[in-house]
Amino acid sequence: MSVVKITVGGAMEDEAARQFVDAWHRAERGDSFHERHLAFESWDALARVLTGKRMELLRYVRRHNVASVRALAKALERDYSNVHADVQALAAAGLLDTARGGVHADYNAIETKIAI
């Protein structure tokens, strides 16, 4: 399963170092793994990116082959400009891929670690 791991606030540097060492050891063993690590400075920063509508959009993209932002807006029955803005924000955060044509979410889960 491909996973996006999100770290929020606190000890992001320590977590990034731990993730690097863990990935290094897995690569040395020849383990195959597919995960992406993202970091947000605060809960507010994460909440600005992962709104309810954007989570709905991510779930739809994960389950369907989406040829274009226009097709996605039509499928979600939402205004094109709002969907376009959401796709741009999610792509900028590293949660969507639009480079290969269409709109893709190449992961099955998002795991979040929030420092308090």
Labelled PLM ranges:
Residues 28-56:
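Short alpha-helical segments that sit at the start of domains
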